[in-house]
Amino acid sequence: MKTIMLCAISSLSAGNCSEDCHYCTQSAGTKADIKRYKLKSPEQVVDEAKKAYANHALGFCLVTSGARLDDQKTEQVACIARAVGKEVPQLMLIACNGMASYDQLKELKNAGVFSYNHNLETSRDFFPKICTTHSWDERWQTNLDAKATGLQLCCGGIYGIGESKTDRASFRTSLKELAPFSSPINFFIANPALKIKTPRLSVDEALKIVDDTVLALPNARIMIAGGREAVLGERQYEIFDHGVSAVVIGDYLTTKGEESCKDIAKFKQMGFEFASKCH
């Protein structure tokens, strides 16, 4: 029987980011209609983790808004990771907290984090056109430091933000060099508050992106994340015919996802089992 890995997201904090990433509704200066809040309590996140596990999630991603970790935020995320690990030890903890130093990443690993998610987002050449407050090279270095600590790497990006086919190929070459454990694919969803005004990707183009990513990263778990429902619509479950082996269930950081119960029922109908441990 075929197996897929399900991942759920806990947005520990939201909004008020200092960075100007043009594709993100949490970025500086945007007036997007999103929830903005400071750090959730460990108890609140543990409750979310229990619900995620009940919905067959293996991965549980602890996400904070903002450009990077500082020592205080590192300890806060580590505290939450320890609390979740104690109450729901079956979950594979993923941290997604922006740019970080080797020592900060090591602290997260020691707190029970299995994998660090820090997306390159796009090619090195195109990145300055969609973000000016930090560099692609800083993102690259964080990924190298995460690998150096022994954390598994979760690294991918976003498509449909105005990048060329050459940018996509260059981006995938960089991912191939990093050799991540898992690689999320996000499809851009337009928002009136954002600077990017590109048309939505077609379903066929989105699936071609999936094909090219699977080909470039044969040893990685290819995960479809943001934009799955909006871009792929009724054809969203075709992703599994194109080599995808992981999906995000439930809501994303600032956009609604498919209802978990609907996804799970469909996955079962398709004959999938749910991964219960990492390989």
UniProtKB/Swiss-Prot annotation:
User: Residue limits of the Radical SAM core domain?
Assistant: 2-228
Quick one: which pathway? Cofactor biosynthesis; biotin biosynthesis; biotin from 7,8-diaminononanoate: step 2/2
CC cofactor: [4Fe-4S] cluster; [2Fe-2S] cluster
- Superkingdom of this protein's organism: Bacteria
Q: What is its EC number?
A: 2.8.1.6
Ligand binding ([4Fe-4S] cluster): C17, C21, C24
The answer, when asked if Iron is one of the entry's keywords, is yes
- Keywords from the named record: 2Fe-2S, 4Fe-4S, Biotin biosynthesis, Iron, Iron-sulfur, Metal-binding, S-adenosyl-L-methionine, Transferase
How many cofactor units bind, and how?
Binds 1 [4Fe-4S] cluster. The cluster is coordinated with 3 cysteines and an exchangeable S-adenosyl-L-methionine.
Q: Which positions in this protein are listed as binding [2Fe-2S] cluster? A: C61, C96, C154, R221
> What molecular function terms (GO) are annotated for this protein?
2 iron, 2 sulfur cluster binding; 4 iron, 4 sulfur cluster binding; biotin synthase activity; iron ion binding
Catalysed reaction(s)? (4R,5S)-dethiobiotin + (sulfur carrier)-SH + 2 reduced [2Fe-2S]-[ferredoxin] + 2 S-adenosyl-L-methionine = (sulfur carrier)-H + biotin + 2 5'-deoxyadenosine + 2 L-methionine + 2 oxidized [2Fe-2S]-[ferredoxin]
Q: Which family does it belong to?
A: Belongs to the radical SAM superfamily. Biotin synthase family.
Q: Which PANTHER family match?
A: BIOTIN SYNTHASE, BIOTIN SYNTHASE, MITOCHONDRIAL
Cite the NCBIfam families for this sequence.
bioB, PRK08508.1
Record's function text: Catalyzes the conversion of dethiobiotin (DTB) to biotin by the insertion of a sulfur atom into dethiobiotin via a radical-based mechanism.
Its quaternary structure?
A: Homodimer.
What is this protein's name?
Answer: Biotin synthase
Organism, scientific name: Campylobacter curvus (strain 525.92)
**What lineage is on file?**
Bacteria, Pseudomonadati, Campylobacterota, Epsilonproteobacteria, Campylobacterales
